[in-house]
Amino acid sequence: MNEISPPPKSKFSRRLPRSLGIIVQRNCHISDARFAGDYSLCIYLLKMREYYRWEKGLPLGASLSNEAVGRWVQQRERQWEQVESDPYEQLHMVGQRFDPFDNDGINRELLPRGLVYSGGYGRFCKPHFFLGRLLRTERCRGYTVLISANEYARDLTAPPAMTLGRTIFLRRESLRRVVWEKIEEWRWKRQNQAMTRALAGLDVEHELERVLERVTDRELTWIIRHEIGEIMAGEQLGDAWHDMLLTVARTPAEIFARAVRDQLADFLSTLPVLLECADTASIDFYFAGLHGMRKELCPTLVRAYQDWVDTGDLDELNSMLPAGKRHWLSVAHSALDLHRQHGDECAHYIEGLMKDSRM
């Protein structure tokens, strides 16, 4: 077994067995070693700077030494080379061994101790592992929501939320970091008018920490609604969707398919509640975060948002909800049909759906 350095001791809680934290972090390193090469160089370096900041426990706004980050990146890449071919380790607790994807079994032991763990698959079918302090547990529409605070182990990419079965894992520390990154991008470019409106009345320049706390707490609600939408979408698409994603992993077809499911989830859950609440700042923040493939797929939704900005009338956005649900469910089923028809060769055909799938 190859050795790899664990995170600093300061990352670990007194209630956490240090050996457990080391194993989880090791599995994170193995996953990163296998998948870090999937990012473009620019995205990779940005993610590594953020990862360095987290591992060193530095404040979000702290300036980073390029020289120090560079040395750390080189060291981390050497460590990844040592573990890339290693299998993921089982977790050892109370005399038992747990598969790293046995979330229910692991959390039965950890939740009473104020800890939470998740192991699941994200974009490009990359395994994501994390271990954190349990902030609170909620129930929402029959689903269990586990909200974490401080993170003791994580991988290069730290998704703020993940749904596994009927459990939603929401990582507040990661969400806070995402909010900060969006605000920082806006401060540099000042081109995102939706973000300008979302932050109106907040003193970003002088009270950044307070703004981060406020916006993060506000966005927790909508992250949960999106994850509930993911569950609802999964109930309509079935297990065949996961099989299809495995087939098209690491292709443009996967990016497209995930964007379609995100759209379906939002039309099923996020947008109906968001528009019903008519929370101006949250609506603006939602559209400020709409980018890439998802924005490209829904020009009509973006125009309806602009109509609301101009008139203050939500009718255009509300009128899109029924048609949006039908449209994205239809596109998702079309992708599944292509997978059934073409099997391992379906990626090319699914990519062909992109042009005619815009709404």
PLM regions and their residue ranges:
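N-terminal low-structure segments adjacent to metalloprotease catalytic domains
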Residues: 1-136, 207, 359
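Post-HEXXH active-site segment of zinc metalloproteases
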Residues: 3-13, 233-262
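Long, well-structured alpha-helical subdomains associated
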Residues: 37, 58, 65-70, 74, ...
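Active-site scaffold of zinc-dependent metalloenzymes
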Residues: 150-217
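Short, charged/polar micro-motifs that form catalytic or ligand-binding hotspots
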Residues: 210-222, 251-259
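Active-site recognition of the HExxH zinc-binding catalytic motif
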Residues: 218-235
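Post-HExxH zinc-binding segment in Zn-dependent metallohydrolases
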Residues: 248-285
